[in-house]
Amino acid sequence: MSELFKKLMDQIEMPLEIKNSSVFSSADIIEVKVHSLSRLWEFHFSFPELLPIEVYRELQTRLVNSFEKADIKATFDIRAETIDFSDDLLQDYYQQAFCEPLCNSASFKSSFSQLKVHYNGSQMIISAPQFVNNNHFRQNHLPRLEQQFSLFGFGKLAIDMVSDEQMTQDLKSSFETNREQLLEKANQEAMQALEAQKSLEDSAPPSEEVTPTQNYDFKERIKQRQAGFEKAEITPMIEVTTEENRIVFEGMVFSVERKTTRTGRHIINFKMTDYTSSFAMQKWAKDDEELKKYDMISKGSWLRVRGNIENNNFTKSLTMNVQDIKEIVHHERKDLMPADQKRVEFHAHTNMSTMDALPTVESLIDTAAKWGHPAIAITDHANVQSFPHGYHRAKKAGIKAIFGLEANIVEDKVPISYNEVDMNLHEATYVVFDVETTGLSAANNDLIQIAASKMFKGNIIEQFDEFIDPGHPLSAFTTELTGITDNHVRGSKPILQVLQEFQNFCQGTVLVAHNATFDVGFMNANYERHNLPLITQPVIDTLEFARNLYPEYKRHGLGPLTKRFQVALEHHHMANYDAEATGRLLFIFLKEARENRDVTNLMELNTKLVAEDSYKKARIKHATIYVQNQVGLKNIFKLVSLSNVKYFEGVARIPRSVLDAHREGLLLGTACSDGEVFDALLSNGIDAAVTLAKYYDFIEVMPPAIYRPLVVRDLIKDEVGIQQIIRDLIEVGRRLDKPVLATGNVHYIEPEDEIYREIIVRSLGQGAMINRTIGRGEDAQPAPLPKAHFRTTNEMLDEFAFLGKDLAYEIVVTNTNTFADRFEDVEVVKGDLYTPFVDRAEERVAELTYAKAFEIYGNPLPDIIDLRIEKELASILGNGFAVIYLASQMLVQRSNERGYLVGSRGSVGSSFVATMIGITEVNPMPPHYVCPNCQHSEFITDGSCGSGYDLPNKNCPKCGTLYKKDGQDIPFETFLGFDGDKVPDIDLNFSGDDQPSAHLDVRDIFGEEYAFRAGTVGTVAEKTAFGFVKGYERDYNKFYNDAEVERLATGAAGVKRSTGQHPGGIVVIPNYMDVYDFTPVQYPADDMTAAWQTTHFNFHDIDENVLKLDILGHDDPTMIRKLQDLSGIDPSNILPDDPDVMKLFSGTEVLGVTEEQIGTPTGMLGIPEFGTNFVRGMVNETHPTTFAELLQLSGLSHGTDVWLGNAQDLIKEGIATLSTVIGCRDDIMVYLMHAGLQPKMAFTIMERVRKGLWLKISEDERNGYIQAMRDNNVPDWYIESCGKIKYMFPKAHAAAYVLMALRVAYFKVHYPIFYYCAYFSIRAKAFELRTMSAGLDAVKARMKDITEKRQRNEATNVENDLFTTLELVNEMLERGFKFGKLDLYRSHATDFIIEEDTLIPPFVAMEGLGENVAKQIVRAREDGEFLSKTELRKRGGVSSTLVEKFDEMGILGNLPEDNQLSLFDDFF
């Protein structure tokens, strides 16, 4: 037994006979984990063998009980050196398991605890009745049981269940018997009730007229039950923790899910909260008619429910089986003041305040408008990302939005010395002093010790040390922090005498302190209080001295510095020790300054040492900044930008001089308790606060509830102190004749939302200032957060009632309204599109268009071409879109010149001008022939052909040349709208390899100062919020049921967490304006090393005002380029109607394999757009044979409710075919126009359908469209299909993707080894080289293994990706090609290489081997062979683990461990 274990056993008073037993002979404590916040101690014990069950229970009882006395929860687990046990011991521990937290759920315990177990030599077997031996218990409970047995010391004991037939029959018989008894009892109770009712009726007086009645009136019984339900007592949800009957809850629904069973019954699973907790509910409806009765069960509705609380197998938690339900009225908070007496909130945060506030700007504005407030100000922390949404919502709500932010203000330079004089630093006498206080507020806390060392040339020549009695007992926190007790201060000199003596002590010296602003501020406040002169002599702050001498140090506190410079500090936070240590540091700093910085004079400390970037370490003070007019808007954009891109250090900072330079059009408020005016008032008194408040335009005061955490932090004594601070702030305003505004520091809307903010804030950990703890050791806890909900006018007046009615009304209502009137309306988001100016852009677009059109179609142009170009150019040039087209054309051309194709996305392929100038390959004209020799053309305009690629080959009748075929029949309206004025969104797919170059092209074309990455805002996702809730639950000893966890996670989600950038979006600012006309800028995720700045606003907020280019990276262009490099074939010359390629969609014969060999009936594996399981299934069902049908498939697979439950059924039932169903959005307009509808109506119907609005528009509007379609013989199935669609894919997008896919497919058919090489190099996501190079049998076996895992839902994401790779490996091998092994001297770093009919994998295909190491291996082998494994590790940078893997796979051959020649290196 170890000494530590023995000591623990003695402490918990373990019985002597157990301590002396053999099982404790070599017991030990392996580890103890202490969780301070949750007060949990986890013990990990080691024993020579398993403990007898009675010893285990004794140990558990005594350990838990002993620690409980200290309010600590103790748990333990055991590692047994020898695991040997009997069935009896196994059964004992099995019973014990259900007393442990892991296994004590009611359903598990009730079903399993009485079962028998035995050990069969390899597993513990549980004999169970058949209905218990099911997947639910296996998946949800057996793993817990295995885990618990591991904690008992049984190691990795496998557990399984077997069905016991006898037990099953016995339980069935028992159940039937009990059921009969229950039915009999129920009948007896019913008869007794009827007899009692009859007895009452017999004893009642006879009525004048007797009407025969039934003995049992069902409707009356329901009515009585309902009356009882409405009067029933409401149970708070938090009080229900076990199964109970006839419980009544009231609450709000926050989650609803409806399901229909195979029998047609409906289940409504919903969750409600009453804000004490939450509960899962379940309500059944027998049919559709009954289901309609429960339409009130919807998200946000308030209900009263009654039912039984049961453990539910489906929800896996306590769930109410709802019997009665009723919608109730929820009385929301209202602003009760008259309409002309409503306040204005001037300090409100939205969910854009990073990890700090909850409401969306829309919800804040809506609430203010609902309450009748005339205006509301938005003041997020250091950002303005809510401005655009706030601007739009305020206009909609008819309320004035005042736009602002709560800024982090810092001084430009923080001085080292104050009150400088011309003095030789090395001839001066210094008084190095420190004070100890009862708190941080000079105005509210007391001095309790002043200590100082008078020093000359590094020697202490005199000391001062006096305690001061504050006149009240010291707090436990003060005593614990400083070591000063009431005995130290009791009987000490009067404070006036101590202050006078200290002033005398300091005469003629330089004062020195660490963080001198605090110590000097405290001294001056006390000097002023006792009418003594303030400090005027020089002061040196060693904190700033250290920061400027040693900026590379992370911490400059007294403790870290004394450790670094080996200066003794015996009792930190006792003034005498701190002062002496600070003095020793001072002379170290003076020596460094003299010898290495040439600083010898006091005047030089600030001029030579204070760094230009000292603002980075300056203390942050909050200020609220508001936009008064349009000039102010641009200035606030500039301030936000500078704070993020130039002055960012931990947070976005605004140096005071920068604020001064941009103050026009802005108004400033003093902000919260972190503002400098409040801090000065707290620390130095009202006069200091008045001096600082001159800088501001108004004074903020907040409700006492906002300041209460300061009491807990010992900054303010009590509620009276809070009220006095508020009165003092009002006095500051009165002295300066500045308005005082009552503001709410709003962080959430409803009081009950407080918990969500608590969870978000606490997730930041103790490193966040807001979570800094109060107290020390185990008792340390963060201060409570303030009650920061959005208050109504009457609630705000109540908060300030202590001021008297008139003064409260003045600061809450009068002043806020008067000040709000000073703000002009501003245009945050512009109403027009502003594109860059490019010289002759319109002419160049027109010239390029006509030049290409003449080249293809001849001059003069066919009328159909000429009219289309004329129509498009009128829209493009007339609306200022030419620059957008020209910019895209230049980018595509540059990428083409670098050897890459560029694919188009979205609906840009609907524009024929885009086709002609080279932006897209998709030709949107009707299907047509055109002669490449004489330009003669023929157009098919009757809708009989869906794609020009499907036209039969034909020779030109004029010159005999084979016609070229083209045209996808896509109307221009689908790109720029029916009126051609919609801002074009041109999305382009560049090769991932070429994407960085394309991004730089934008800078080159438009200028770096006008090109920015499109910014994004990342918010807390619900899964992340779930983790925050569980962490909060753990750290703060909370216990939430699953429904409450879900509710809290939902409430905490959506808060801004970080910023980022769109993967391909670049915003271009017009070169006749600057970016601050539209948005501030910043770096993504505050990464100051990023190559690009981003828009501060989410790019969607300004995408209709500036040019946005989507320059996305995509695999298809990369793949095409790779295939071109391998084959030398120009992909643009590949015909899209290659008959062998089309055979891939109907079978596998063209690949030379069978369905059985490759596991799929078509050749779709690895073909872009068509290779997923979902689309392969569609191909199998439809067997497309034309390009037009492939477009249909692409549209059907990308749309929502277009295929499943819609087109799929129509095709199966023979109502429609693949070519006639609705596939792409554009087909609707084209089909309806061919049917005879007017273009405008055809366009409008298409827009309604593609956006899923068909069933949301008014019935009159919808009926009008239906009638028009029927009048033109559009079939009913087509109309019904329109009503089911939620989203549709653009045909131009489909055409671009299918065209790329067919080019890839061409190589798969005709040049297979090139195809597989390109696929594995670019598209494959996972590799398993050992399997891939082991031949067909190994590949098929691994695929079977993953398939079986998928069926059990056990396959990992990596295995799923690997399966896709192996499908292609299998196909390649079945086609007669080989997969080689990784080769140390032949493999490429990143690409597969071809050797005859074999693919050699690259180094990056090895699991765990990254690109950098792969390239290092290739570089190293160029310098000569590797002579040993050690040399491979050193020269190749390969880890030992990878070397072992190489060796296991036979890659290293007979390479020795060490280079034998190296043994003799020292001799040469």
UniProtKB/Swiss-Prot annotation:
GO terms for molecular function: 3'-5' exonuclease activity; DNA binding; DNA-directed DNA polymerase activity. It comes from the Bacteria. Gene3D superfamilies: 1.10.150.870, 3.30.1900.20, 6.10.140.1510, Metal-dependent hydrolases, Nucleic acid-binding proteins, PolC, middle finger domain, Ribonuclease H-like superfamily/Ribonuclease H. GO terms for cellular component: cytoplasm. Residues 197-217 are annotated as: Disordered. Its main location: cytoplasm. GO terms for biological process: DNA-templated DNA replication. SUPFAM superfamilies: Nucleic acid-binding proteins (SSF50249), Ribonuclease H-like (SSF53098). It catalyses: DNA(n) + a 2'-deoxyribonucleoside 5'-triphosphate = DNA(n+1) + diphosphate. InterPro entries: DNA_pol3_alpha_NTPase_dom (IPR011708), DNA_pol3_finger (IPR040982), DNA_PolC-like_N_II (IPR024754), DNA_PolC-type_N_I (IPR028112), DnaE2/DnaE/PolC (IPR004805), DNAPol_HHH (IPR029460), DnaQ (IPR006054), Exonuclease_RNaseT/DNA_pol3 (IPR013520). It is found in: Cytoplasm. Keywords: Cytoplasm, DNA replication, DNA-directed DNA polymerase, Exonuclease, Hydrolase, Nuclease, Nucleotidyltransferase, Transferase. Residues 430-586 form the Exonuclease domain. It is an enzyme of class 2 (transferase). Required for replicative DNA synthesis. This DNA polymerase also exhibits 3' to 5' exonuclease activity. Belongs to the DNA polymerase type-C family. PolC subfamily. This is DNA polymerase III PolC-type. The gene is polC.
